[in-house]
């Protein structure tokens, strides 16, 4: 009998094997250490802090780490144990005691911990999220088509470097409309003397930039046209987290920034909160539901705190006649222009919310009126009803931290409109499960300059960002473009879109022909 030996490869130049084995060809090589943890076993005694911490070893980038691919919410365990008859009465007594103890301070109570449950303060309302490590991809504000050509990509992390040497001086072109006076009765409202928030049936007029009759008549005063809300979106872009988009029209040496047709301005809620700030399983606390609620609360609060029996303050000119002002609230518009240098002159429509009486011998002062609404204080901040009267500064700091983008837009819009004061209302739900009824718990006036400083808003940097975007768009050919804030990357993409993109189909061709004739001033600017 003979012994057959396998082929042995010899390495004459060093130690170790040579060549490759075919059975190992398709196995990828991944470096690892024997001290690394291969995934993580179940540890029911660990707490939330230990679960979130990875002291060493594998992490999300290690190929050996176990990853949850499917949603296990539908997975349940079936209890097949048999209940013994002799423990029947004793079991009922124990279950009754356990229920009563959990009702006092169980795992989801979030209050004073009961004897039979976990400590409420630590594992209260957030305990249902301790095992929720799913990556949440934010939704895009619009579907990006493959046929759109990418022209530019703005890195938001570099926006801090753009600035202007001096703040541009605003020049008022004209003022239109009327605004009502602030009712000082609401200064006496506090958490113990709350007032129900009333609902208004009127809406805010939505006038696209290119359809604004005043901008049409005064278009020679600038070459970049927008509204204060659109300018605020661009100026606060580096703080934004959620996706947004703005349409850009390049006509000759002029730029028009406006909202996409069919869309309206909505406020965000807890946009800058890094924790679990959206609950997809709760229909009233989703991102879209909270946004609609905050937008309606702001409109209702704005109209309620204005005096209805006092003659409103009228500006120099009346609003142009048009259907867009029917069933709308009283608004005041101030059209202003800013010269940023390098042939960039901005002409914008700014909005004024209200007016307060000045000191004796002084003219009235224009103000902005906004509101923050509380929907779940156990998860997102300090409870308004308990701490508003004693810790109002702490509540404001928490709200600015969680809503830095929204506060930046508000203060920028107020600065552009020339409003030195902002009236902020503190509104809460009448019931935590009711997003339709709210109460006013307090009001406070804040200097706009202080809000800018507290939120880290530098107007020189804001104007520098706008100038950089405008100069980039000025280099483009005539056409329609879209500025899109990527939902999951810290960039803004500039796409070239067809001329008929986003156009709404209208049945009445007569109105379309009149619209084309009235835009002759745009064609003139092409020359």
UniProtKB/Swiss-Prot annotation:
Residues 517-527 have a biased composition (Basic and acidic residues). Residues 504-516 have a biased composition (Acidic residues). GO terms for biological process: cap-dependent translational initiation; formation of cytoplasmic translation initiation complex; response to bacterium; translational initiation. Its main location: cytoplasm. The keyword Cytoplasm applies. Keywords: Cytoplasm, Initiation factor, Protein biosynthesis, RNA-binding. One of its GO terms (molecular function) is mRNA cap binding. It is found in: Cytoplasm. InterPro entries: eIF3d. GO terms for cellular component: centrosome; eukaryotic 43S preinitiation complex; eukaryotic 48S preinitiation complex; eukaryotic translation initiation factor 3 complex; phagocytic vesicle. It comes from the Eukaryota. Residues 100-136, 503-527 are annotated as: Disordered. Residues 264-277 are annotated as: RNA gate. Residues 107-123 have a biased composition (Gly residues). Component of the eukaryotic translation initiation factor 3 (eIF-3) complex. HAMAP family: eIF3d. Belongs to the eIF-3 subunit D family. The RNA gate region regulates mRNA cap recognition to prevent promiscuous mRNA-binding before assembly of eif3d into the full eukaryotic translation initiation factor 3 (eIF-3) complex. mRNA cap-binding component of the eukaryotic translation initiation factor 3 (eIF-3) complex, which is involved in protein synthesis of a specialized repertoire of mRNAs and, together with other initiation factors, stimulates binding of mRNA and methionyl-tRNAi to the 40S ribosome. The eIF-3 complex specifically targets and initiates translation of a subset of mRNAs involved in cell proliferation. In the eIF-3 complex, eif3d specifically recognizes and binds the 7-methylguanosine cap of a subset of mRNAs. This is Eukaryotic translation initiation factor 3 subunit D. It comes from Dictyostelium discoideum (Social amoeba). The lineage of its organism: Eukaryota, Amoebozoa, Evosea, Eumycetozoa, Dictyostelia.
């Amino acid at each position: 009998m003979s012994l057959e030996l396998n082929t042995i490869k010899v390495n004459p130049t060093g130690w170790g094997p040579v060549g490759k084995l075919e059975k190992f060809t398709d196995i990828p090589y991944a470096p690892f250490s024997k001290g690394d943890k291969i995934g993580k076993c179940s540890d029911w005694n660990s707490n939330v802090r230990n679960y979130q911490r990875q002291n060493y070893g594998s992490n999300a980038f290690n190929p050996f780490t176990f990853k949850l691919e499917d949603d296990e919410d539908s997975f349940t365990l079936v209890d097949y144990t048999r209940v013994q008859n002799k423990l029947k009465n004793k079991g009922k007594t124990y279950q009754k005691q356990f229920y009563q103890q959990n009702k006092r301070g169980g795992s989801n109570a979030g209050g004073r911990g009961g004897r039979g449950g976990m400590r409420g303060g630590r594992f209260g309302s957030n305990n249902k999220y301790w095992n929720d490590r799913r990556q949440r991809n934010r939704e895009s504000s619009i579907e990006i088509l493959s046929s759109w050509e990418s022209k530019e990509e703005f890195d938001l992390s570099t926006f801090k470097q753009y600035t202007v040497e001096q703040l541009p001086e605003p020049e008022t072109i004209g003022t239109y409309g009327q605004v009502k006076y602030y009712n000082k009765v609401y200064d006496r409202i506090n958490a113990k003397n709350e007032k129900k928030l009333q609902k208004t049936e009127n809406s805010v007029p939505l006038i696209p930039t290119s359809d604004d009759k005043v901008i049409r008549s005064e278009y020679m005063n600038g070459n970049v046209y927008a509204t204060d809300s659109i300018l605020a979106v661009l100026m606060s872009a580096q703080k934004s987290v959620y996706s947004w988009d703005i349409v850009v029209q390049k006509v000759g040496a002029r730029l028009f920034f406006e909202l996409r047709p069919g869309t309206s301005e909505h406020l965000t809620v807890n946009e800058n909160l890094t924790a679990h700030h959206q609950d997809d399983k709760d229909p009233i606390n989703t991102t879209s539901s909270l946004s609609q609620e905050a937008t309606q609360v702001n409109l209702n609060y704005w109209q309620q705190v204005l005096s209805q029996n006092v003659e409103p303050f009228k500006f120099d000119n009346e609003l142009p006649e048009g259907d867009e002002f029917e069933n709308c609230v009283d608004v005041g518009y101030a059209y202003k222009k800013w010269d940023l240098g390098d042939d960039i002159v901005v002409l914008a429509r700014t909005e004024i919310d209200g007016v307060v009486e000045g000191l004796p011998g002084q003219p009235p002062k224009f103000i902005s009126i906004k509101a923050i609404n509380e929907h779940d204080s156990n998860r997102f901040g300090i409870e308004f009803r308990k701490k508003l009267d004693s810790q109002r500064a702490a509540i404001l700091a928490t709200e600015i931290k969680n809503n830095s983008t929204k506060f930046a837009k508000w203060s920028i819009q107020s600065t552009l409109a020339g409003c030195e004061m902002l009236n902020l209302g503190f509104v809460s739900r009448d019931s935590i499960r009711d997003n339709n009824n709210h109460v006013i718990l307090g009001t406070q006036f804040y200097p706009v300059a202080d809000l800018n400083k507290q939120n880290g808003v530098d107007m020189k940097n804001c104007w520098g960002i706008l100038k950089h975007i405008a100069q980039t768009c000025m280099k483009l050919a005539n056409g329609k473009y879209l500025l899109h804030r990527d939902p999951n990357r810290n960039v803004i993409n500039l796409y070239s879109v067809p001329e008929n993109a986003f156009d709404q189909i209208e049945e009445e061709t007569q109105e379309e022909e009149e619209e084309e004739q009235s835009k002759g001033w745009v064609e003139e600017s092409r020359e």
